[in-house]
Amino acid sequence: MKLSIFSHCALDTIHLEGNSYEQIGGAASYCGIMAREFKFDVNLFTKFGSDFPKQYLTEHKINLINSESDKNTTKFSISISGADRTLKLENECDPIDYSSLDADGHIVSPIFHEISNDVLKKIKDNSNF
């Protein structure tokens, strides 16, 4: 089965107990990798900059559709203190463009402003639900 995912990849800096950790984040990364684990063919509609380690996606054989941007990747800083969490946007990448591809399903999971109403309408119009 073919799955199209529309979401930004992100870079997250997590601050916890005086230490900082950097990792990939965003629904695009997690949904894409998990869908491949379930043997879906994945087309990922996303945007990221040259600062994003895209090998995490390509080594899972995720098809990247018009994904590279001249801007840096969307980035969040996440501070964790006990049960409290603070999330700060540090950078916002380009919005995602729509491209039509044959898919059995679509996941639209924006993390911050990357899906315009026009793009969402085109996704819905191209879906069979």
Q: What feature does the model see in each segment?
A:
Residues K2-I5, G25-A27:
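Short hydrophobic/aromatic-rich motifs at helix boundaries and adjacent loops
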Residues L3, L11-E22, E37-N128:
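Conserved N-terminal subdomain of the carbohydrate kinase-like
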